[in-house]
Amino acid sequence: MKKAYVKSYGCQMNAYDAGRMADVLAAEGYSATESVEEADVVVLNTCHIREKAAEKVYSELGRLRVLKGERAESGQDTRIVVAGCVAQAEGREILSRAPAVDVVVGPQSYHRLPDLLRQSRETRVVDTEFPVEDKFDHLPARRNRGVTGFLTVQEGCDKFCAFCVVPYTRGAEVSRSVAAVVEEARRLVEGGVREITLIGQNVNAYHGDGPDGAPATLGHLMDALSAVPGLLRLRYTTSHPNDFADDLIAAHAGNPLVMPYLHLPVQSGSDRILHAMNRRHTGDAYRRLIERIRTARPDIALSSDFIVGFPGESDADFAETMRLVAEIGFAAAFSFKYSPRAGTPAAEREDAVPEAVKTERLAALQQLLDQQRHAFNAAAVGTVAEILVEKTGRHPGQVAGKTPHLQAVQFDAPASTIGTLVPVRITRAGSNSLFGEVLEGAAAAA
């Protein structure tokens, strides 16, 4: 049987797309392999958000060129595919920089991958079009891969933040219908998935057709998904502060399947930098939104993204970011040094922050965020949380899962608990995960 190796870089959307590409190849008779050395087709599903991520891809392609040559010497053919956002952004340039690549395919065209592979027998192929037809209408049934699963409900972004390539690589905002999303969710749950994370570049801008033909909101969509038998948990990512509607806040307060965890990027605490980033909100507007959300769901865990060293960022601007973080408090966060991306407005600016200053600011911000994360985890010790068991643990007799607040937990319990909710008393907090013990009688009941 032919074998396919699919590697994904970057965001949850890429992870979803990588899984769907594996499904497309499986429908063509390819079995999945974890060994790139034995793969007949190698797919790199790429990320273009930061320069470092893109360069990782080219480094990997250099290694694959050697592997392809070695396999050819033994009479084995290898097709190399570059998919995702680097493919969309750089197109034919990839063929020039990486001679071993056979197919370049964008994130809206990968449903055509089998045809592109066949064409590549004659000539190298690039397909980065935004097709008129919806790719989701052409994808095969999903193959389930665990207790949790991603489900794309929205793609693209219309915000055009000054630093971001997503509007150029993923296109304008489009949403799937409520019926299509619910049907995919139903199939996932029938296959064993118990927690679904709804994903989109700007997921709370969701506006898919509802049952009556009118646009539905993300809150309405989650209400519809809550009726899927067997579904235990719902999450969603990533959101923009400007699209956070009242019905979504109400879903956190009133829908028991919606978990008390929210990833809501702010990027900076400085109004001057937020304006330069074209974020369309202020630091105080973000604070007021968080206050409303916490009023509706006091136990919610907050996560965010931060960029340090955006062009023109002064010491005073960075101090505003530190002040916002200190005032709000985050359970988790992702912070990065600004990386210019070709074609974005920010890349044209000439007031770059020195690399040494970026590094210093990132270290200071990360130290504060780490302190907040450790404090949040430590506060869980002594409490009881319902853990959705996802897999076996690192040690014999151990399983692992997550709290409603997305904290990883390890504890002793039989493998039969996988896919169930188990009440666990948290006994210890590590640097990146929690440890606990099952309440007496709970594991046996599960």
Swiss-Prot record:
Gene3D superfamilies named among the record's database cross-references: Methylthiotransferase, N-terminal domain, tm_1862 like domain
InterPro entries on file: Elp3/MiaA/NifB-like_rSAM, Methylthiotransferase, Methylthiotransferase_CS, Methylthiotransferase_N, Methylthiotransferase_N_sf, MiaB_methiolase, rSAM, rSAM_horseshoe
Cofactor note: Binds 2 [4Fe-4S] clusters. One cluster is coordinated with 3 cysteines and an exchangeable S-adenosyl-L-methionine.
Subunit structure: Monomer.
Organism: Methylorubrum populi (strain ATCC BAA-705 / NCIMB 13946 / BJ001) (Methylobacterium populi)
Chain sites annotated for binding [4Fe-4S] cluster 2: C157, C161, C164
GO CC entries: cytosol
Disulfide bonds: none
Protein name: tRNA-2-methylthio-N(6)-dimethylallyladenosine synthase
Positions annotated to bind [4Fe-4S] cluster 1: C11, C47, C85
Keywords, in A-Z order: 4Fe-4S, Cytoplasm, Iron, Iron-sulfur, Metal-binding, S-adenosyl-L-methionine, Transferase, tRNA processing
SMART domains recorded: Elp3
EC number: 2.8.4.3
Domain of life: Bacteria
Record's catalysed reaction(s): N(6)-dimethylallyladenosine(37) in tRNA + (sulfur carrier)-SH + AH2 + 2 S-adenosyl-L-methionine = 2-methylsulfanyl-N(6)-dimethylallyladenosine(37) in tRNA + (sulfur carrier)-H + 5'-deoxyadenosine + L-methionine + A + S-adenosyl-L-homocysteine + 2 H(+)
Similarity comment: Belongs to the methylthiotransferase family. MiaB subfamily.
TM helices/strands, residue ranges: none
Record-annotated MTTase N-terminal domain positions: 2-122
Domain (Radical SAM core): residue spans on this chain: 143-375
Domain TRAM: start-end pairs: 378-440
Pfam families, A to Z: Radical_SAM (PF04055), TRAM (PF01938), UPF0004 (PF00919)
Cofactors demanded by this protein: [4Fe-4S] cluster
Top EC class, one word: transferase
Principal cellular location given in the protein's record: cytoplasm
Function: Catalyzes the methylthiolation of N6-(dimethylallyl)adenosine (i(6)A), leading to the formation of 2-methylthio-N6-(dimethylallyl)adenosine (ms(2)i(6)A) at position 37 in tRNAs that read codons beginning with uridine.
Gene Ontology molecular-function annotations: 4 iron, 4 sulfur cluster binding; metal ion binding; N6-isopentenyladenosine methylthiotransferase activity
Cell location: Cytoplasm
